[in-house]
């Protein structure tokens, strides 16, 4: 099936169901096999919502998308992609914007740059650049009129493969692929959607979606009876918040198409998942790996420092950082 054709059809369907803010679906690049993946039940696609303007990082984000800002020497979005690749994903969908062309440039091949690096003897970096998108596909769709996370995920409906897919928020960096792999395994076992969870102090729940467990948690997995977006502290059903990792069955798009504005006047993904849970199982998996929230400059700096010290995705910088700290102690 023509990918562009799929985009046009999806655009029309979403428009008829009230998502008129979707201006276009643009398939920018394709790496690897040119065949659509059909007939597979595996979770193969990652959707990354990346259309936001990154206003907390202005003026830097006026020119450089926040998702491309480096943690060590690796763009934040690449760390999110690497996590998914380690869990078996091979199709990356970026929900971007025409105002952020640098995202498209990052995924575009640069054979001229690779040749220059090899001529200078830097084969390691040339190989690293060549590997971006070499063994996985990249689709880029545009969300020109952002109306919330539910709306952003809906924009990807035209290019999602398979029966279920992953959504990863690029503001949240995880320490490895084990957590996401476990979420995918639970989705495969239950044939239902799965949300990532983390327990927090009850005073923090008002900033997140919060789940109401339907049973006791076993081995980090719990059946979810209900969920609420940004509840008041005294109305929160638990202290288990939803973090930026989801594994969703594709019928979530039916619920997204029916969304009306919720919290903050936006189309909330939480509301779509809640509606889906009325007719299919929903589970949560509590994270067992490090998690960094890079949504603020302070959080971004914390992630860069801690990941360097721990060696999580930031190779070779830990010793340099320790030397800097020691110099300033004296």
Residue positions per predicted region:
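Aromatic (phenylalanine/tyrosine) cluster motif
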Residues: 25-27
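N-terminal glycine-rich phosphate-binding loop and ensuing alpha1 helix
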Residues: 37-118, 143, 179-180
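Residues at the starts of beta-strands that form the adenosine-phosphate
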Residues: 45, 90-92, 137, 192-193, ...
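Conserved beta-loop-beta/alpha segment of the NTase-like Rossmann-fold superfamily
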Residues: 103-105, 113-116, 123-214, 257-258
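Catalytic-core segments of class I nucleotidyltransferases/pyrophosphorylases
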Residues: 166, 180, 184, 188, ...
